[in-house]
Regions:
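Bacterial N-terminal signal peptides that target proteins for export
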Residues: 1-11
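N-terminal, intrinsically disordered, polar/charged segments of Gram-positive cell-envelope systems
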Residues: 26-61
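Low-complexity, Gly/Ser/Thr/Pro-rich intrinsically disordered linker/tail segments
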Residues: 255-259, 272-312
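Acidic/His-rich structured neighborhood in mature extracellular/periplasmic domains
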Residues: 69, 73-230, 238-242, 249-264
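A short, polar/proline- and glycine-enriched secondary-structure boundary/capping micro-motif
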Residues: 264-274
Length: 312
């Protein structure tokens, strides 16, 4: 089996376990200023500027207020009632398994740029329940966004590393027939040039999706995908969606809905701007301090996020 670069860990789910590792981002009780480089829309061309990663508001969807906000935003985006119901059933399945008392009880502001949780305890509780097959970020995003994604030329490509996704899909009887083909095509790994040039990588991702006829059709709900690099030094270099979530409009704010990993919670963050969303994701997932691979590239639907920039 092919091996992901060390900063991603042994399995894909390790990508999402950033919470403990990122707890050292604060200094002296204040959030550090970080230099950032922005990329032009759909190009990945960087330009220098400065930004601060700020504290965020987040919830594990235990409280009714946040659940109602998310439900209303999903409904406003045109999601079917049965899909909204299914989403909250999945949320409750996880929350009940690990115990709601072990999650934040209401919308909470972080002390720094990242939510804090006892991830080891949550994993232990998850395992005590048999490590039940739940949902990860990709399954969650597709469950919410799938009706608004078109794939004209399904071609699964390399899905070797999606074995955990496929196990969950099979046991939960999710995504049958054409829907399953769509999932496999969307999340399959993409062969790319061996380069650290995010502009070039973005072009190759866009070209691959265009060839497959992948398009998104919702102006109130968007899938944000964090593309990462698979390079074991022996096989073809590939880009893959290491994390994904759903961005929703909520008045003049934004809600980002994500499932951190099979064994970690559902989480909803509130942001004042799309730039804050990008900076949060880059702070979470740009963990290759040694520069062994290219920087992550964040897509909004089928194009590079306009607010994409790298935090240094």
């Amino acid at each position: 089996m092919r091996r992901i670069k060390p900063f991603l860990g042994a399995l894909l789910l390790g990508v999402c376990m950033f919470l403990t590792a990122c707890s050292g981002q604060k200094e002296g009780g204040e959030t550090k200023q970080k230099t950032a480089s922005s990329a032009e829309s759909s190009q990945g061309e960087e330009k220098k500027e400065t930004s601060a990663v700020i504290p965020i508001m987040y919830s594990n969807l235990v409280d009714e207020e946040t659940r109602n906000r998310v439900s209303a935003a999903l409904k406003n985006a045109g999601l079917k009632d049965e899909k909204i119901t299914d989403f909250f059933l999945a949320v409750d399945e996880y929350n009940n398994a690990v115990g709601k008392e072990n999650l934040v009880q209401k919308t909470t502001m972080t002390d720094g740029p990242f939510p804090s949780m006892d991830s080891d305890r949550l994993i232990d509780l998850w395992l005590q329940n048999g490590g039940f097959v739940g949902r990860n970020c990709r399954i969650t995003s597709f469950s919410l966004m799938g009706d608004f994604i078109a794939v004209k030329n399904p071609a699964a490509g390399d899905t070797t590393m999606l074995f955990s996704d496929f196990e969950a899909i099979g046991k939960k009887h999710l995504f049958q027939g054409e829907e399953r083909k769509k999932f496999d095509t969307l999340f399959s790994y993409i062969d790319v040039t061996n380069t650290h040039d995010t502009k070039e990588l973005a072009k190759e991702i866009i070209a691959s999706w265009k060839k497959k006829g992948i398009s998104f059709h919702n102006d109130k709900m968007h899938m944000l995908s964090v593309f990462m690099t698979m390079d074991d030094g022996k096989n073809q270099v590939q880009e893959f969606i290491g994390h994904t979530g759903i961005l929703l409009e909520d008045g003049d704010h934004y809600l980002f809905v994500e499932k951190l990993a099979f064994e970690l919670p559902y989480q909803v963050e509130e942001f004042r701007s799309r730039q804050e969303v990008n900076d949060y994701l880059m702070a979470c997932y740009d963990k290759d301090a040694d520069g062994l691979t290219a920087k992550p590239v964040i897509f909004e639907d089928d194009q590079v996020m306009k607010e994409y920039r790298v935090l240094e």
